[in-house]
A protein has these predicted regions:
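Short, charged interaction patches at domain edges and termini
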Residues: 1-13, 53-58, 106-151
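Residues in well-ordered beta-strands of folded domains
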Residues: 46, 64, 139-141
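Short acidic, glycine/tyrosine-flanked loop/strand segments centered on an H-E-D-like triad
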Residues: 62-81
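Short histidine-centered catalytic/ligand-binding loop motif
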Residues: 75-93
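Short beta-strand segments enriched in hydrophobic/aromatic residues
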Residues: 49, 67, 142-144
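Short, hydrophobic/π-rich interface segment
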Residues: 88-114
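Small/polar-rich, solvent-exposed N-terminal microdomains that initiate assembly or binding
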Residues: 1-56, 103
């Protein structure tokens, strides 16, 4: 069964070809390199679970689209934008997430008989990691045909 590898490879390829991303990693979110040695902006793929049905396997995944927050020492007088680039990161990384999901819906993943089920859920984060990262956790389910037989 190679559908798992094909799914994560297609996600990696879709993310890697887009601007506003320098690196794609995979695994548990705790495995993300938070020592400022990674090349940000960064996307990280995690697998939440899989459901096996009669004819398909449903892969529930989250892709984290993130960048380092750059704090400006100038005093913030508006109290709206803040003295960092958090809003810029949320804007660019949501645009990246939207583009990647659309590519997966219409691109090679779709032509390889995979499909995203339903809509992707996007959750912003601004204080999830110790390295002042901000971005989006995008969760979605990809259905793949099972190529396993019981014979």
């Amino acid at each position: 069964m190679r559908s798992f590898f094909r799914v994560i490879d297609q996600i990696k390829q879709a993310v890697s070809t887009e601007p506003f991303n320098n690196q794609v990693t995979f695994g548990d979110i705790a495995d993300v390199d938070l020592r400022k040695q990674s090349m940000f902006p960064l996307s990280h793929i995690t697998v939440n679970n899989a459901t096996i049905t009669t004819n398909i396997v449903q892969h529930n995944m989250t892709v984290f689209f993130m960048d380092l927050v750059d704090v400006n020492n100038a005093e913030d007088e508006s109290f709206f934008l803040g003295n960092d680039n958090t809003q810029d990161i949320l804007n660019t990384q949501l645009a990246l997430a939207t583009r990647v999901i659309q590519l997966l819906r219409k691109g090679d993943l779709y032509r390889q008989e995979f499909e995203i089920e339903g809509d992707a859920t996007c959750e912003p984060f601004t204080e999830r990691f110790e390295n002042r990262l901000a971005g989006w956790a995008v969760t979605f389910t990809i259905n793949t045909k099972t190529d396993m037989t019981i014979c």
